[in-house]
Regions:
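Outer-envelope beta-barrel architecture signal
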Residues: 38-46, 83-91, 128-136, 176-184, ...
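Predominantly the C-terminal beta-signal and adjacent terminal strand-loop region
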Residues: 185, 195-197, 219, 223-294
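Cleavable N-terminal export/targeting peptides
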Residues: 1-40, 276-294
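Transmembrane beta-strands of outer-membrane beta-barrel pores
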Residues: 50-56, 93-101, 138-146, 186-194, ...
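Short glycine/proline- and aromatic-enriched beta-strand/turn motifs that initiate or cap beta-hairpins
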Residues: 26-86, 90, 100, 291-294
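Residues that define the transmembrane beta-barrel architecture of outer-membrane proteins
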Residues: 64-72, 108-116, 130, 155-165, ...
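Residues on the lipid-exposed face of transmembrane beta-strands in outer-membrane beta-barrel proteins
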Residues: 70-80, 114-122, 136, 163-171, ...
Length: 294
């Protein structure tokens, strides 16, 4: 489970993509009228993530499994059209894969999960190029955990729909002459619904119609999760190199089943701000540009 070769490949891939990107990127959003409306560039990022993972699911096994987690994340942020100075939209989509082993290292447990969130935050611009924002989002995720040791119950299904509280803090600064944007963003589900079978219940029984007690209301007593995201964008020109760290803590307890996930991932990727420009028309030198991050 050595991560060093994986990161070497990631860094080479990111470097190749950054070299291939044109100096002016074009986004698919409808063009703005430069004569009056402020310009709202799309801040987008594509990142690869990898790190450690601890996984418990007592539907499959009482043991704690340890291993690695890898992820791909897409993030899109843009100032809202109705009040771009104060409101910002954020869309994320990610895929995560975990490969873990039991304490004896003679059995593996795999986890695959896909997640998407959309939300809005209200922001406040402070002195010294600091921006604070707070708001909410809606998130949906679905996945499965597979344990090769189990015969009748080898798979546990995960699914949740949540309303979250979120926010961020950014600081626009420099390292020498290199522009740098630092950001910290936590996300915590507040309420929602999630899926869990009964302890020992076979999915074949659910298929036959035994579907009572599968959907549960989520609150911090039975479903707690927090994702902490810390990123640094090194602006190298038209695009930026994004590095950072992500932490994901999740715990669910329902139907005598406990699920726990603790993961730490290093982040490397590319980010940038994109504007749509009408063909044959350049950027108005007097246009007001409102960034989503600062």
């Amino acid at each position: 489970m050595e991560l060093k070769p994986y990161f070497h490949k990631c860094v080479k891939t990111i470097a190749a993509i950054m070299v291939a990107l044109p100096a002016q990127a074009v986004d698919a959003t409808p063009p703005d009228d430069y004569s009056g409306k402020p310009l709202r560039p799309v801040s987008a990022a594509y990142t690869l993530e990898a790190g450690s993972s601890q996984l418990v699911n007592t539907y499959l096994t009482p043991l704690r499994y340890n291993g690695i987690e890898a992820a791909f994340r897409y993030e899109r942020m843009q100032a809202m059209r109705f009040n771009p100075e104060k409101w910002v939209m954020r869309l994320t989509a990610s895929i995560k894969i975990d490969r873990t082993e039991n304490p004896a290292k003679n059995a593996e447990m795999w986890r695959a999960n896909a997640e998407a969130t959309w939300g809005m935050t209200h922001r406040w611009k402070l002195p010294y190029n600091i921006t604070l924002a707070a708001g909410g989002s809606v998130g949906a995720n679905i996945g499965a955990i597979y344990n090769q040791r189990n015969g009748n119950n080898p798979v546990a299904v995960e699914a949740a729909l949540t309303l979250n509280i979120t926010g961020y803090a950014t600081w626009k600064t420099h390292i020498g002459r290199l522009p740098l944007t630092l950001r910290y963003q936590p996300t915590v589900p507040l309420t929602g619904i999630f899926f869990s079978p009964n302890y020992g219940e076979l999915f074949y029984e659910i298929y036959l119609g035994n579907d009572n007690g599968l959907i549960h209301g989520a609150w911090w007593g039975n479903y707690f999760r927090i994702e902490n995201l810390l990123t640094a964008d090194l602006h190298l020109g038209a695009t930026a190199l994004r590095i950072g760290m992500a932490q994901d803590l999740m715990s669910t307890k329902v139907n005598n089943i406990t699920t726990e996930l603790v993961s730490w991932r290093a982040i490397v990727g590319i980010s940038g701000e994109w504007l749509s420009i009408k063909p044959g028309k350049g950027l108005d030198k007097n246009a007001r540009i409102i960034s989503a991050l600062y």
